[in-house]
Amino acid sequence: MTNYWPRFTRDNFENSVPPIDYLNWYIPRLQEARRHNLSFSGMQYNWDIQGMLGEKIAEIGKPYMADIEDPRIIIAKREGVSPDNVLITHGATQGINIALLTAIAKIRDKVEGKIIVAAESPTYAPIPQTALILADEVIRVNKTPPTTGYGHWRINYEEWETAMKKSHIIMITPISNPSGWVLHIEDRDWIIAKAEENDVIVIADEAYNDAYRQIEQSRAIHTFGDNYISINSLTKVYAMGPIRFGWLISDSKTIAIAKNIFMTFSGVMSSPTMRIAAEALKRLDTVDKEIEYYRRENLPILRAVLEKHGIDWNEPLGGVFGCFELPNNMNSEVFADQHCKKHDLLVVPGSMFSDRMTSWVRVAWSIEPSLFKSAVEALDKSLDSALN
């Protein structure tokens, strides 16, 4: 069976670049256009672009400079920082690339030997695999599910400290994908303390943080001082993936380096992206309300079906997705490709995120309630088929 989880080594890809394997699984199944879809990791919201831009939509292809409110100013105001602390990028995944290049630029002239990056698991594959391209070595550090069955996924301090003592940079995801759980406040503060102690730069992919703004534990990493880089975008929480709009926030010296790197690779942002984002950023509260509405309407239906099948459900405190473990160590790829496909349903196997999650399934409640109800009915039938 093909392995789809993220890679932390270049084994079998010396003098080359490993693929993002999960896309080889996911894209063909998206193209099947199954009737029911619980696979989305981001909010599904239909923005009225024409209504939002009005007559200015005719200018969408014209240069935007001096013609729109600077999105950096809007983001800076929202995050309580200066515009000089913000860099706009083409989405969060480019933000990962730029952030890591920036961190390496800050240290490479003083590092003797290899540049080493620690990266957490489970994770979004481009995080460790960007490090495989740009750094010399990647050390995997793990988050594990709660032993009680409910609560935060936690880190092992001994394992993480050993890795951080060897590393120059650590890459984390405060809202874990696929669990949906926010980084425990004790673990977060411990990571910050060890980063300071060992002079480690912290890069945080915070693409899901905005769905947890009401939770104190979701405090952005950039707020802890210099050498902390936050990555965010309008993709996952705000359903603007097609325009590829993201940003970095850090201290002004770090952002100045990041800006030079961005301009070297990309020049400037596209006009359609900047024009749409400048307007969408003023209306994010509309989507915030929809997220809470979807949670209220959709989660009780999901809880009931999982309880019916005797499946433990570790529901996250916020956001739009979570994961559960199938009974009897059932392989989740088999579940997705046989039982779910039979009922025209798409879910995401946990093996897309870690080799330790081969019996886990990620589901999202980020779709309109009537669609979600039908999808969960298909999930119910799929579980019946798989477990009975």
Pin down the residues of each PLM region.
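N-terminal small-domain helix-loop-helix segment of the aminotransferase-like
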Residues: 2-98, 283, 386-388
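PLP-dependent enzyme catalytic core of the Aspartate aminotransferase-like
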Residues: 80, 118, 329, 338-347, ...
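A short helix->loop->beta-strand "cap" motif at the edges of active sites that frequently abuts
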Residues: 115, 136, 197-200, 226
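Active-site phosphate-binding strand-loop segment of PLP-dependent enzymes
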Residues: 143-214
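Conserved PLP-binding catalytic core of the aspartate aminotransferase-like
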Residues: 309-342
